[in-house]
Amino acid sequence: MASVLLTRRLACSFRHNHRLLVPGWRHISQAAAKVDVEFDYDGPLMKTEVPGPRSRELMKQLNIIQNAEAVHFFCNYEESRGNYLVDVDGNRMLDLYSQISSIPIGYSHPALVKLVQQPQNVSTFINRPALGILPPENFVEKLRESLLSVAPKGMSQLITMACGSCSNENAFKTIFMWYRSKERGQSAFSKEELETCMINQAPGCPDYSILSFMGAFHGRTMGCLATTHSKAIHKIDIPSFDWPIAPFPRLKYPLEEFVKENQQEEARCLEEVEDLIVKYRKKKKTVAGIIVEPIQSEGGDNHASDDFFRKLRDISRKHGCAFLVDEVQTGGGSTGKFWAHEHWGLDDPADVMTFSKKMMTGGFFHKEEFRPNAPYRIFNTWLGDPSKNLLLAEVINIIKREDLLSNAAHAGKVLLTGLLDLQARYPQFISRVRGRGTFCSFDTPDESIRNKLISIARNKGVMLGGCGDKSIRFRPTLVFRDHHAHLFLNIFSDILADFK
């Protein structure tokens, strides 16, 4: 399929690269690379098992005041640098998960440290304003230097938020207001609308819906949770909305061996999208918008072809639905383009696009026609954080200056090639290797083996993340280089060789 042609090309070239199959073959040593010792370490250093004794003690203390069962270990961020995360027991790990894909240019980047230390920036970091009513003098300037400098095609409007969930939540509200405005025309709010909205009834609160996909993750607030379908524990016991849920393609790998089957699978899913839009219109729960991730991340790193997304965009236009692309995890450069949807090759890729994580702040871009028609309709106290815009402007400068998008593409190719090698040698443990840039993943036989591999890797000095039922995902920073990929591949090759 077109969405991950790189995987196909690498798989084909791999078949001719027999040296990768030679027993004892090693990826080139990380020692051959030039390491900036002021920013990056030269490799992992493990002193205890993870979590170590200090982490376990702190976990006990935290568990007294909140459920701390999700905590992996406690970190020493003062000592963490570049691609390496250091814990409170002194263990230094190559971090290929980067705080759930949210660290853009590594830990404690010197340029960001310098920025924070500059006297003229002190007030920005200590005075957090209510941006909707009292923004600082340089607010527009910093937005232009940061977010607006990477605005996606066709979207000139921008609203900042604090996180991915509130970005999607407010994007939903924006879509609903846009849709109702289309229906209302130039008329003002009616007296009935103003009264019924206060008691959560129509017509003031119209019964619109957002179509989402099975396997999606869009956040944990009430509206977002209605479009999140990745893990039951995220949703259980919480009331939700009757909104349509379409199947997302489940592609078969290797892609070049299942072209016809995958095309049929995508066609089936697109047909179901259209059927659901029609069905919910008849139910008087009109689909006002469609939300989709360019790569379903939390749900298992599920890919679809570029053609699938182009056709999905066409469906949204045909039925008058807003098209919302959730780039919270895929945005920021890890796929080799700043926004993953750029791979689709569309001049009009979306009506609304949300972001967070690597972007340092949350928020969403949107077209002019989605602009709220009155103040306080999309609003909260902080509406983001100017200090994050300041940091992001420097992050974007570094991405451009160091050509980190090209780096993500190249280092990702090294990583993906190595994973295909490991898949060929250890098919009993690794399958469905896939990825775009460094945004890579593979499947394991089951959840138990997946979790065991992640745990062993952590104790060998490598941080990995899980997703879906049995997948391992890679979310390194943009300063993840070829030699970091080789280092990981050597360590993980040894793990697989000894795995029982």
Curated annotation (Swiss-Prot):
Binds 1 [2Fe-2S] cluster per homodimer. SUPFAM superfamilies: PLP-dependent transferases. Pyridoxal 5'-phosphate binds at residues 164-165, 381. Pfam families: Aminotran_3. Keywords: 2Fe-2S, Acetylation, Aminotransferase, Disulfide bond, Iron, Iron-sulfur, Metal-binding, Mitochondrion, Neurotransmitter degradation, Pyridoxal phosphate, Transferase, Transit peptide. [2Fe-2S] cluster binds at residues 163, 166. Catalyzes the conversion of gamma-aminobutyrate and L-beta-aminoisobutyrate to succinate semialdehyde and methylmalonate semialdehyde, respectively. Can also convert delta-aminovalerate and beta-alanine. The modification N6-(pyridoxal phosphate)lysine is found at residue 357. The modification N6-acetyllysine is found at residues 252, 279, 318, 413, 452, 470. GO terms for biological process: gamma-aminobutyric acid catabolic process; nervous system process. It is found in: Mitochondrion matrix. This is 4-aminobutyrate aminotransferase, mitochondrial. It comes from Sus scrofa (Pig). One of its GO terms (molecular function) is 2 iron, 2 sulfur cluster binding. Its cofactor is pyridoxal 5'-phosphate; [2Fe-2S] cluster.
